[in-house]
Amino acid sequence: MEFILSLIGSLLLVICVLVSVAFLTLLERKVLGYIQIRKGPNKVGLMGIPQPFCDAIKLFTKEQTYPLLSNYLSYYISPIFSLFLSLFVWMCMPFFVKLYSFNLGGLFFLCCTSLGVYTVMVAGWSSNSNYALLGGLRAVAQTISYEVSLALIGFKILLFSLL
């Protein structure tokens, strides 16, 4: 019974995160509309609330294209894997009710965020384009260099909180 409740809780968490991302993009569009002195997305429906749902319908009904010489399976699996990794990060966050008991939640967070780098590299490699591969390798090198400083800052905060 506890497993079913934790599964329902994690599914509810994932749905809330995805819906909140949709409405944060709506907020971003509204702020950009006010900054640029133009009409924002608040003209659709009631205060623009249906806009994220219309965007989702538009994205799901678009024609899917892929490079002709690409590795088709890894070209489409790598963004999906990246999405799942970013959703797994939310499972280790402490909430009022613990979904899963993590003794090493910080290490799980660092592992999931560092694995997200390699999906960019696989997407660049699987397109069979030299430019996409170089861009993926550049993104990997840049992200790894930022992760080292992030981990050192996190360990410094952890060390000073223990003293």
Swiss-Prot record:
PROSITE patterns: COMPLEX1_ND1_1
Transmembrane segments: 3-23, 77-97, 104-124, 143-163
Gene Ontology molecular function: NADH dehydrogenase (ubiquinone) activity
Membrane topology annotation: Multi-pass membrane protein
Taxonomy, superkingdom: Eukaryota
GO BP terms in the entry: aerobic respiration
GO CC list: mitochondrial inner membrane
Enzyme class: translocase
Keyword Transmembrane tagged: yes
Reactions catalysed, as given in the entry: a ubiquinone + NADH + 5 H(+)(in) = a ubiquinol + NAD(+) + 4 H(+)(out)
EC number: 7.1.1.2
Compartmental location: Mitochondrion inner membrane
Record keywords: Electron transport, Membrane, Mitochondrion, Mitochondrion inner membrane, NAD, Respiratory chain, Translocase, Transmembrane, Transmembrane helix, Transport, Ubiquinone
Family designation: Belongs to the complex I subunit 1 family.
Protein name stated in the entry: NADH-ubiquinone oxidoreductase chain 1
Gene behind the chain: mt:ND1
